[in-house]
Curated annotation (Swiss-Prot):
Gene coding for it: cspE
Record SUPFAM superfamilies: Nucleic acid-binding proteins (SSF50249)
Domain of life: Bacteria
Species this chain originates from: Bacillus cereus
Pfam families found in the cross-reference section: CSD (PF00313)
Name listed for the protein in its UniProt record: Cold shock-like protein CspE
Taxonomic lineage from the root: Bacteria, Bacillati, Bacillota, Bacilli, Bacillales
Cited SMART domains: CSP
Length: 54
């Protein structure tokens, strides 16, 4: 299931952060889950789409 949300915060040095989804809950994100080339980071307020894994 693909969800969308906004990056609540992301610590590039530690490599993790949280994304806030529409219902107000937070989803943990680790840098290893970020797709794309180059440095893997997210900006606060950035709109993202993602899949949740158990």
């Amino acid at each position: 299931m693909t969800l969308t949300g906004k990056v609540k915060w992301f610590n590039s040095e530690k490599g993790f952060g949280f994304i806030e989804v529409a219902d107000g809950s937070d989803v943990f994100v680790h840098f290893s889950a970020i797709t794309g080339d180059g440095f893997k980071s997210l900006d606060e307020g950035q709109e993202v789409s993602f899949e949740v894994e158990d």
